[in-house]
C-alpha cells in the first residue's frame, strides 16, 4: 500500500515588496485613468517610490500630487455632467486596481452574510 504525506505542499507565492506593489498599481492607475506610463513620471525610479513609502505618503496622495502639479485630466470618464468631475484618484479607484492586478484576494471564508 502506498502512503501519501499527511501535509500537502501548496505552491508558495513570493511576497512582493512594497516598491513592487506600488509599481504594479501605478502602472495600472496611470495608464487607465490618465493615459500615462510609469516612465512618464518620476516613479520610473524605484528610489523615488521607496522615498514616498518611507515618508508615509499614500499611493493616492502621491498620484494626486502629480495630478495637481501637472494638471492631469482623467481619460476614463465618458460624457459630460452638470457637476465638475474631479481629476483625482479615490480609494475606490485604488481598490479596483488592486483587484485587476490580482493584489486583492477575496476569501470566501471571511465573508459575513
From Swiss-Prot:
This is Toxin YkfI. Disruption phenotype: Deletion of 3 type IV toxin genes (cbtA, ykfI, ypfJ) leads to a slight reduction in resistance to oxidative stress, has no effect on cell growth. It comes from the Bacteria. The keyword Cell membrane does not apply. Keywords: Toxin-antitoxin system. Toxic component of a type IV toxin-antitoxin (TA) system. Acts as a toxin inhibitor that blocks cell division and cell elongation via FtsZ and possibly also MreB (although no interaction with MreB has been proven). Overexpression results in inhibition of growth in liquid cultures and a decrease in colony formation. These effects are overcome by concomitant expression of cognate antitoxin YafW, which leads to toxin loss by an unknown mechanism. It holds the Pfam family CbtA_toxin. GO terms for biological process: negative regulation of cell growth. Changing residue 65 to S: Loss of interaction with FtsZ. Belongs to the CbtA/YkfI/YpjF toxin family. The keyword Nucleotidyltransferase does not apply. Induction: Expressed in mid-log phase at lower levels than toxin relE. Interacts with FtsZ but not MreB. Encoded in prophage CP4-6.
Amino acid at each position: 500500500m502506498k502512503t501519501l504525506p499527511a501535509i500537502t505542499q501548496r505552491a508558495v507565492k513570493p511576497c512582493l515588496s512594497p516598491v513592487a506593489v506600488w509599481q504594479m498599481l501605478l502602472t495600472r492607475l496611470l495608464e487607465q485613468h490618465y493615459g500615462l506610463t510609469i516612465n512618464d513620471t518620476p516613479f520610473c525610479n524605484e528610489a523615488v517610490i521607496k522615498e514616498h513609502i518611507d515618508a508615509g505618503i499614500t499611493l493616492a496622495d502621491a498620484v494626486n500630487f502629480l495630478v495637481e502639479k501637472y494638471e492631469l485630466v482623467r481619460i476614463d470618464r465618458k460624457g459630460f455632467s452638470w457637476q465638475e468631475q474631479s481629476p483625482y484618484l479615490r480609494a475606490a479607484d485604488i481598490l479596483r486596481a488592486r483587484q485587476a492586478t490580482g493584489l486583492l484576494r477575496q476569501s470566501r471564508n471571511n465573508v459575513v452574510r
